[in-house]
């Protein structure tokens, strides 16, 4: 088996694994970009780990990079199986037990801390804006930054599951140098 075929197989397997975990277990994701860390995200992350361990919860706890709402850091997302991913902002360590007790264990969103939710999946939450309704995000069409806030920047598995290295594999095995140059020119990369 070639390295490219192995990469494709690994990507498919990781996407399936992440999809199953995302559907079957609650997920808590903390924004751990430099802005989040400076605002206290590392302490919030540790408080989540401690609370999950103390309660013996079967929850996926992860991190992601900056999504772009630095003024609301630390950010914490909760997604229950079959539900929307809800973002909480300006989260303090003292808020962690309340978010876990209310949202993770009882499915009740903590409205005073909720800042937005991801509208993919056809969800609508009354009184909480979706990301595409927020002024900062509504006119954005993320291309190069499409994975920001969605993958763990320290996880090679997350990167591969999101299609990382696929373009490199294609360039090295399927395209001529002239085709690569034409592709880059046609892409119209900007920003």
Model-assigned labels for residue ranges:
Residues 1-191:
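Feature of Fe-S/electron-transfer and energy-metabolism proteins
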């Amino acid at each position: 088996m070639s390295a490219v075929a192995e990469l494709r197989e690994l990507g498919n397997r990781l996407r399936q694994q992440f999809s199953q975990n995302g559907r079957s277990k609650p997920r808590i994701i903390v924004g751990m970009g430099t802005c989040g860390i400076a605002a206290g995200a590392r302490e919030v992350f540790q408080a989540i780990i401690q609370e999950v361990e103390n309660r013996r919860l079967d929850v996926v706890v992860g991190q992601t990079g900056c999504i772009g709402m630095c003024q609301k850091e630390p950010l914490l997302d909760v997604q229950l199986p079959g539900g929307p991913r809800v973002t909480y902002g300006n989260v303090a360590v003292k808020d962690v037990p309340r978010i876990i007790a209310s949202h993770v264990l009882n499915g009740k969103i903590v409205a005073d801390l909720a800042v937005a939710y991801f509208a993919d999946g056809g969800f609508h939450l009354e009184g909480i804006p979706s990301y595409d309704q927020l002024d900062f995000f509504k006119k954005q069409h993320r291309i190069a930054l499409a994975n920001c806030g969605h993958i763990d920047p320290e996880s090679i598995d997350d990167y591969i599951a999101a299609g990382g290295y696929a373009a490199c594999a294609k360039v090295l095995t399927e395209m001529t140098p002239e085709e690569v140059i034409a592709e880059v020119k046609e892409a119209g990369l900007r920003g």
